[in-house]
Amino acid sequence: MTGEESGEVVEPRAADSPTAAGILLQFAAQAFCRVRDASFIHVNLDSVAHNIQVLKSLSGPNTGIMGVVKGGAYGSGMMKVVEVLVEEGVKELSVAKVGEAVYLRKRGINHPITVLGNLSTFELPDVMQYNLIPSLSWTTPLTSVPRDTLVYPDGSPLRVAINIDTGMSRYGVQPCDLRAMVHTLDDLGVSINSMYTHLQGSITEKKKNQKQIDIFLEATEPYKERPLTRHLAATTGCVQDLGTHLDFIRPGGAITGLSSGADRESAQQFANCGFRPAFSVVVRPTYFKLLPAGRFIGYDATYETRGDEWIANFTTGWSDGLSRRLSNGVGAVKRVKTGELCPIVGRVSMDSITVRLPEAPGEDDVFQVITDDFDDVTSAVGMARNLGAAVYEMPGNWSTRLARVYSRNGKIVHVCNALEYEC
């Protein structure tokens, strides 16, 4: 039950490991100086590398990884995450939009890139120029252009990924229409690079997903001898061990340690695989004061102090990506030094939050708005569960107004400054 449901604010909790806290405090002190701001996003690239190794252990010995890095690698910053994937031997990448793929090409990434969003004709010039692999649910975008335009600069034919609808009912050719689609592509001289589908069910719905896999395998069986690959296991499939024996797995959220499901059972199954969240939001108070009983705080006066209370201000709000629904005790921040959860009181406003502390904070006190763990309140999965939201929204909604600080082995290796478009 959340604070909103019970009418009570989140109360402090016991401390975590002092060793881990000490490391984070030391790291944060350096990071605050680098970003010159009282809040930043921390992306632990060691966790990304670790998660790739977990994914390798969950897939077959001859199965490759197609790393999905759409949406700025789910909020962590696409470029720095991709660099780790390349180091860890990931062979292919995928994104949602052509523009994301072009961004990677312009920064020297030469891996095969599949664009998962359904191709539109006006995207073809960029697809051809940058040697991308577009997804098709029908052949219309290709039949309306001259055949001689469907050739990459090196003279090789356009390669496409066929999306097959096995139950998601969004994009994808119907299995009964696949044969005709393949025939048309053959006539156009277009090469089929892969066939794939997307599972609809959550981590706890294995039977539903198995039905989709059966449909996919039956539909693609006639094309097994062609030089194409098949893939369907995104994060959910990897956790369920469904489709992990095919040519590729296609994880996205798992790369940065994000469960595809927010419910407790899904999150527990995901955590049991050994994944580590890489994303956190680190803050320190910019002002605090002791208020007497009977003071109303913030817009609309939604919180009244019950007695003498230490109230601290933090410069992060809904404009940065923190949900306004975490107002009035639904959400909390974690005090790193002690592990206490300190409730957000009053509204989450555009640029700040007010938090009730058990005492005046010290000069070296550091807090986390989103924690890189599976905490019931402050982690991405905990927040999503309490808000009835998707886990991927929690880091994915954070804007570029906060700097992103990247670490390896506890050391800062890169800072993507605030308001830079992408990292």
Language-model features: locations:
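Active-site-proximal beta-alpha core segment in soluble small-molecule metabolic enzymes
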Residues: 13, 23, 27, 33-35, ...
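Active-site anion/phosphate-binding pocket segments in diverse small-molecule metabolic enzymes
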Residues: 3-45, 49, 57, 100, ...
